[in-house]
Curated annotation (Swiss-Prot):
Together with LptE, is involved in the assembly of lipopolysaccharide (LPS) at the surface of the outer membrane. This is LPS-assembly protein LptD. Residues 1-21 form the signal peptide. InterPro entries: LipoPS_assembly_LptD (IPR020889), LptD (IPR050218), LptD_C (IPR007543), OstA-like_N (IPR005653). One of its GO terms (biological process) is Gram-negative-bacterium-type cell outer membrane assembly. Belongs to the LptD family. It comes from Legionella pneumophila (strain Lens). It is found in: Cell outer membrane. The lineage of its organism: Bacteria, Pseudomonadati, Pseudomonadota, Gammaproteobacteria, Legionellales. Its main location: membrane. Keywords: Cell outer membrane, Membrane, Signal.
Length: 839
């Protein structure tokens, strides 16, 4: 028969008010105590699973089960102590004994055992400790310990547990299950920190042998959410694979300092690659990741990323440094005779990348984007992302923007580092803007509903000297003043609109170093008016398609543009160029980009758009547009520049269209969503002047579930493929390029990822990678291999960077340094969610 504490017992163990009850604890406490030195067998693991509250569930696809929750109903007062037992023997001057279904509760701490001994201070008669023996179960919120012996100290709420099987629920970012393990001793401190002696630690299910940490000691800091294992071994399927004297790991979602999972890889240009990242959580709003890389063919590279977030600023600084690159030294030695430009280059390789956005005031913002590399070959040697490997212009820009109700003011400095790898198509440098000053105003409350846009811009253009293109070193440079006020009067009705507009463009140039024209200075002033009339109608009707009701719109649009001709071939080209023709170009007021060329025009654009909108939600299911420009005169303004004032553009120049044909290409665009998972977009432009396709693209995206993705794309650009020929000249050919990428689950835990990009024009691949990924309950693994186009060799055949990487993620023990070693997954598989990504 269970009994409550009698009155005589009350005087013995009273501690700041004792509450007691005669309720009987009927739940049995299982005997799950096995000495720490006993090896785990399958039978023992099965027994441990029951002890820890593991519930097998085959409907749980990843973990195949779950833990029963740990619930403790707290007492009314955190200092209240309640003790129950079947029998009790009390002594005023000795320890007291409680036997049979013993349960003690203090606040949210509950301890069950078969036997308990109560000790008191002989002077104060206050309870100093309670010792529990035989089938001990120790519970706290998110904590369970089953042990041979436990000692609790009611006064400071600390305790010790011996020969322990434990389960600690922790809120980690990537672990699906609580941590569990064994220890010869666990100390629970008054601040709720824990010290585990001769302990194991894993977040795998009890019967899963995937991985475990076996350590001399493990300290868990509850406040910092951090665990530290000392003299630790990492066991994979019970085999020791790694020893470390110190291992730090998180116990909650907060960022923690410590080593991250290593990066292991191999490439044909760098050899074997081992990266050992260390994450330093400097402050809640500052952190740094240091990544030393060992390349067997190159040497030791030290890299890092520093991130910061303040009330006004956010930014990232990335840097890498590799002294005395062995492979690069051999490259210079082998090629410096044939290519003297590379003679004297340093073998110290480095890069810096700085991005910052600072909001000084609500209307004053600074943006910085700076990138620099040590030499022309750095990106080829150390990047596996096609967009980076083939990049030849690195931006360096800072701008300060101030906004008011009607005006925006901006000051900017901009330059580029131009890369010139040997035996490749020469790349022309880009003009520096040092500085650019811009003011843009907008007023929409004028009489007659008129709107006024004003743009004023000053650019100081500077041409960087380039040892690779000496012939271009005497290019023109100097200031350019640009003014462009626009007055328009939009007249809007529910059924349509008409917007007449008038504007003028004024450019002033003060040119120095006028290259080979025999003059050192020249001034040009240009004032050109523009007139336009834009109008459109809106029609709609109900549409019923496959059981769904839609609203179909029909939107015809006309746009007339008149710009008189002014000869501009004497004026240098700082930032103007041809643009790829598509639907968007139908309604532009200038067929050139930038401000240096103001295209003459006497033309009418006509287009038709139809949309399908879901009747209930308004979501757009389809959008189809088609249009063309009718020219009433030839286009006389040329992009080229000449000291004689007369020149003709090369018809094979990328983006150039016929200047004499009576109509523009026919531009069309389609967007269609078959369902929420499947959509297709495409542009097709047909040129009647050449009776051929001018450019086209088609993109397909299919994503029925997260990380079940198929993307396909094709693009065609006439004259878009610049090819180097044997005599070091270049020729323009049509560019055909296709890309296919996918991420698809192969089973509940296995998935495949891959992408392939092929240059149909040149008959070789640009980029390809293929990987397989395993994502289980407590660990994940990914192996990813591929190659990226690097350059052409002496025989004008493609050369590639070949890479393979292995990543292993032990969930609950830390994250990897980056979402993937090469940074290509999110680039080439839009919509992909990376389980390896550090949040």
């Amino acid at each position: 028969m269970a009994i409550g504490i009698t009155a005589c017992v009350l005087s013995l163990i009273n501690y700041q008010g004792l509450a007691y009850s005669a309720a009987l604890i009927n739940e049995p406490i299982q005997a799950c105590v096995i000495a720490r030195e006993v090896d785990l067998t399958d039978d023992i693991r099965t027994k441990f699973a029951q002890c820890l509250g593991w519930q097998a569930d085959q409907s749980s696809p990843v973990c195949l089960g779950f833990y029963k929750p740990i619930t403790v109903t707290p007492l009314a007062s955190p200092d209240e102590v309640r003790i129950l037992a079947d029998t009790a023997s009390f002594y005023r001057t000795q320890r007291s004994t409680l036997s049979g279904h013993v349960e003690m509760q203090q606040g949210q701490r509950v301890v069950n055992a078969q036997t308990a001994y109560v000790y008191r201070d002989p002077k104060t008669n206050e309870v100093t400790k309670i010792e529990f023996l035989n089938h001990v179960r120790y519970l706290e919120p998110d904590r369970m310990m089953i042990a041979r012996k436990a000692v609790v100290y009611p006064q400071d709420k600390s305790g010790e547990v011996e020969d322990v099987l434990y389960r600690f629920n922790t809120n980690r970012s990537n672990a699906l299950l609580p941590a569990w393990g064994r220890a010869s001793l666990i100390k629970r401190f008054a601040n709720q920190d824990y010290f585990l002696k001769e302990a194991t630690y894993t977040t795998c299910a009890p019967q899963d042998k995937a991985w475990a940490i076996e350590a001399e000691s493990i300290s868990i800091n509850n406040e910092k959410g951090k665990g530290i294992a000392r003299n630790a071994k990492l066991r994979i399927h019970e085999w020791p694979v790694l020893y470390t004297p110190y291992l730090s790991f998180p116990t909650n979602r907060d960022r923690k300092s410590g080593f991250l999972m290593p990066i292991v890889g191999y490439s044909n240009v760098g050899g074997a690659d081992l990266g050992i990242p260390y994450y330093w959580n400097m402050a809640p709003n500052y952190d740094m990741t240091l990544v030393p890389h060992i390349y067997t063919k190159r040497g030791l590279m030290l890299g890092g990323q520093f991130r910061y977030l303040t009330s006004k600023s956010t930014g990232t600084f990335n840097g890498n440094f590799l002294p005395k690159d062995k492979a690069f030294g051999r490259f210079l030695q082998d090629n410096e005779v044939e290519f003297p430009q590379i003679r004297g280059l340093s073998t110290n390789r480095w890069e810096v990348n700085f991005v910052d956005s600072t909001q000084f005031l609500s209307d004053l913002q600074l943006n910085v984007n700076f990138q620099q590399v040590s030499d022309d070959y750095y990106l080829q040697d150390f990047s596996t992302n096609l967009a980076s490997v083939t990049q030849r212009q690195l931006l360096r820009q800072a701008d300060l923007t101030y906004t008011t109700e009607n005006w925006t003011f901006r000051g900017m400095g901009q330059s580029y580092q131009t890369l010139h790898p040997i035996n490749e198509i020469p790349v022309s440098p880009v003009y520096e803007r040092l500085p650019q000053l811009m003011a843009r105003g907008y007023y929409d409350d004028l009489p007659f509903n008129a709107q006024l846009n004003i743009l004023g811009q000053y650019d100081q253009f500077h041409w960087p000297n380039d040892s690779w293109n000496i012939a271009l070193n005497n290019m023109p440079q100097g200031p350019r003043f640009h003014l462009n006020p626009i007055l328009s009067v939009p007249m809007m009705k529910p059924w349509g609109y008409v917007t007449p507009s008038v504007q003028f463009v004024e450019n002033y140039y003060d040119i120095s170093r006028n290259y080979t024209w025999g003059t050192s200075r020249a001034n040009y002033n240009l004032t050109i008016p523009r007139y336009s009339l834009d109008g459109g109608l809106y029609f709609e009707r109900d549409l019923h398609l496959k059981g769904t009701y839609y609203i179909q719109t029909l939107e015809p649009r006309l746009f007339y543009l008149r710009v008189p001709y002014y000869n501009q071939t004497l004026i240098p080209v700082y930032d103007s160029g041809f643009m790829i023709f598509n639907v968007d170009q139908l309604f532009r007021t200038n067929r050139f980009s930038g401000f240096d060329r103001i295209g003459d025009a006497n033309q009418l654009s006509y287009a038709l758009t139809t949309r399908w909108l879901e009747d209930e939600s308004g979501a757009e299911k389809a959008n189809f547009s088609i249009g063309q420009i009718k020219y009433f005169s030839e286009r006389r303004v040329q992009l080229c520049q000449s000291p004689t004032g007369f020149c003709t553009d090369n018809p094979d120049t990328f983006g150039n269209l016929s200047s004499t044909f009576g109509t523009s290409p026919v531009a069309s665009r389609a967007v269609y969503k078959f369902n929420p998972a499947w959509g297709i977009t495409g542009d097709y432009i047909w040129d009647p002047a050449t009776r051929a396709t001018n450019n086209a693209d088609l993109n397909l995206h299919y994503q029925p579930a997260r990380n079940a993705i198929i993307n396909g794309g094709y693009s065609y650009l006439v004259n878009g493929d610049v090819t180097q020929v044997r005599n070091n000249d270049t020729e323009n050919n049509a560019l055909h390029q296709a890309i296919l990428s996918a991420a698809w689950p192969l089973s509940e835990k296995w998935s495949g990822i891959g992408a392939y990009s092929y240059n149909i024009s040149k008959n070789y691949s640009m980029m390809s990678f293929l990987g397989v990924q395993y994502d289980s309950c407590c660990w994940a693994m990914r192996i990813l291999g591929g190659r990226t186009f690097r350059s052409l060799n002496e025989e004008f055949e493609p050369r590639y960077n070949n890479n393979i990487y292995l990543q292993i993620l032990l969930k609950g023990l830390g994250s990897v340094a980056s979402s993937d070693p090469s940074g290509i997954l999110n680039t080439y598989i839009p919509g992909y969610y990376d389980p390896f990504r550090r949040r």
